[in-house]
A protein has these predicted regions:
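Extracellular/periplasmic carbohydrate-active domains that bind, remodel
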Residues: 1-173
Length: 173
């Protein structure tokens, strides 16, 4: 299953702010409500074992996937899980509301390209608490949509609280 064009609101990811063909995230939620992902496990994208980080701006069939992508989701809690070695952004909620990310570790090598830690895009009511970020790009990058989605919906991310988070490698929050 793939997005058919740049106007598909219910897609498996966005690239440069447009809903384009992408590899699905390791964990993908579309229209999910009242869900919890909790545990002490690790979601390892193993991007370092392939060529995901080489020529990272070149599309290979589809754009590089995320580790977690939430599209139009509501009342979601992610707690205690570790995310590492994503091919691209790690945690990417998109047009979602009432999100809590608690006591999570997000890591990637310091030289890994575009491995942002947390990229909320056009989301509302977000809490990040007790997070540890050490990535090859932005630890946190707050987005309002870009190109087609930004021009169409004009929806900035709003009401976001960040507390007790450690940001190491990467560009901070």
């Amino acid at each position: 299953v793939q997005s058919t064009d740049e106007t598909d609101d219910y897609n498996f990811g966005t690239w440069e702010g447009n809903p384009l063909d992408m590899f699905a995230a390791a964990i993908t939620g579309v229209n999910v409500e009242d869900a919890v992902l909790c545990g002490e496990g690790t979601i390892d994208g193993q991007a370092h074992k392939g060529d995901w980080w080489q020529n990272h701006r070149v599309r290979r069939g589809a754009w590089r996937g995320r580790l977690l992508f939430l599209n139009h989701c509501k009342n979601i809690t992610v707690q205690g899980v570790s995310f590492c070695n994503s091919p691209s952004w790690n945690l990417h909620p998109y047009f979602s509301d009432d999100l809590r990310f608690l006591d999570i570790s997000v890591t990637a090598p310091a030289d890994s390209p575009n491995t942002d830690g947390f990229d909320p895009e056009s989301c509302t009511n977000i809490l990040l608490a007790g997070m540890h970020f050490s990535t090859g790009d932005d630890c946190i990058a707050i987005k309002a949509g870009k190109l087609y989605m930004g021009a169409t919906y004009k929806t900035p991310t709003s009401n976001m609280e960040v507390s007790h988070c450690l940001m190491e490698n990467g560009h901070g929050g």
